[in-house]
Design a protein with these regions (language model features):
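Nucleotide/pyrophosphate-binding catalytic subdomain
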Residues: 1-189
């Protein structure tokens, strides 16, 4: 299938950004703060602005809260307990959102944070509430930035899987396209 055929009926896209693609790995130290590369976050904000300017709705699913919190506390990745990862997520989430907010603000774009869990998406009432909230944000050209609510989840934080969350969100918002940005070559299972 040709790219134009795929994009012809496109109205809404979900983009999942993995923590590895916004981290400091192989990137300039000058833009680094709490493990996040501000240069890369600004780059993705510019790209999302271009997509939005073409008339597409964009929903962003982002990882990075646990990493940012871990970096902020000066902890290594190895050996963290579930409660420690949850604490890192709680600390890192606000910094992650602040970084996105500043990058999108430079493009005159507004963002909104939505934290979801499998429990939210498995409960019909909460699922519909999330859907309606996202629809209201998109109607106002606000970019919803969704992350797993890692500070209260247990199973999901063990896996660290926002790929599954992004697929569920794509269904939730009736997206025609899901883009997963990751350092994994191919499909990860």
């Amino acid at each position: 299938m040709i790219r134009q055929d795929i994009l012809k009926d496109l109205k809404r896209v979900v983009i999942k950004i993995g923590s590895s693609v916004i981290s400091n790995k192989d990137k300039r130290q000058s833009s680094l703060e709490c493990g996040l590369s501000k240069d890369w976050v600004r780059h993705y904000a510019r790209q999302i602005k271009l997509i939005q300017d073409k008339g597409y709705d964009v929903v962003l699913v982002s990882s990075g809260a646990v990493m940012a919190g871990r970096e902020r506390l000066g902890l290594s990745r190895a050996g963290l307990s579930i409660p420690e990862k949850q604490a890192c997520a709680a600390i890192g989430q606000s910094f992650l959102m602040h970084t996105y907010e500043k990058a999108f603000e430079k493009k005159n774009m507004k963002v909104a944070q939505i934290l979801l869990s499998n429990d939210d998406l498995g409960n019909r009432r909460r699922y519909l509430n999330a859907k309606h909230t996202i629809e209201a944000l998109l109607a106002r050209d606000v970019i919803p930035i969704i992350n797993e609510n890692d500070s209260v989840t247990v199973e999901e934080i063990k896996i660290g899987d926002n790929d599954t969350l992004s697929a569920t969100v794509a269904c939730l918002v009736d997206a025609q396209l899901l883009i997963i940005l990751s350092d994994v070559k191919g499909l990860y299972n």
